């Protein structure tokens, strides 16, 4: 008899956390572990005690025609990774040496269903992960395979290159005139 891997087990839990998301465009769920125990969870949602997009009945970014991946400050929601880190801080939980698992889905414009996509933290979340002391990030993918990153590799890359050279975060190299 075989069992699913621990990474798949935790990514499945992150998927369930994502189902609490209150974003019309996407659902993301994050869990953070220390010593093989879940210490925090987070999903895409509005700040505590404020109305989310579902309650308001609209997406502010859609109304302003803001493309996906841009102008995050014009979104009512906080990202799943950020919420998981914030929830740990609120509970006084130390994240040093922890592992973050992230599951992501995007709404399909044709079917209205949410399809699993390759998860990857935005650049702001990546910086928060680094500063929180999390050591490892495990990302879900549409293929069902997980991708594992050592946060120390991100730091090393940013030490030898500029932050704008982070092709995985940006999808392309920014062309900055000096």
Predicted regions and their residues:
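Short glycine/serine- and small hydrophobic-enriched flexible loop segments
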Residues: 16-19, 34-37, 86-90
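Short, basic/aromatic recognition patches
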Residues: 2-27
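Short beta-strand scaffold segments in enzyme catalytic cores
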Residues: 27-42
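Zn2+-dependent cytidine deaminase-like catalytic core
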Residues: 4-5, 12, 40-178
């Amino acid at each position: 008899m075989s069992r699913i891997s621990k990474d798949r087990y935790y990514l499945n839990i992150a998927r369930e956390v994502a189902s609490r998301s209150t974003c019309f465009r996407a659902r993301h769920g994050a869990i953070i572990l220390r010593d093989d125990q879940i210490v925090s969870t987070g999903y895409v949602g509005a700040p505590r005690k404020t109305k989310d997009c579902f309650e308001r009945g609209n997406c502010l970014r859609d109304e302003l025609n803001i493309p996906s991946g841009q102008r995050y400050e014009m979104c009512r929601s906080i990202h799943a990774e950020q919420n998981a880190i914030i929830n740990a801080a609120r509970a006084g939980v130390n994240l040093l040496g922890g592992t973050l698992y992230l599951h992501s889905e995007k709404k399909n414009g044709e079917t209205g269903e949410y399809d699993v996509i390759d998860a990857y933290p935005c650049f702001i979340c990546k910086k928060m992960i680094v500063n929180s002391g999390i050591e490892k990030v495990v990302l879900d993918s549409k293929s069902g395979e997980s991708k594992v990153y050592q946060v120390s590799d991100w730091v090393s890359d940013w030490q030898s290159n500029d932050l704008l050279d982070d092709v995985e975060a940006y999808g392309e190299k920014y062309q900055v005139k000096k």
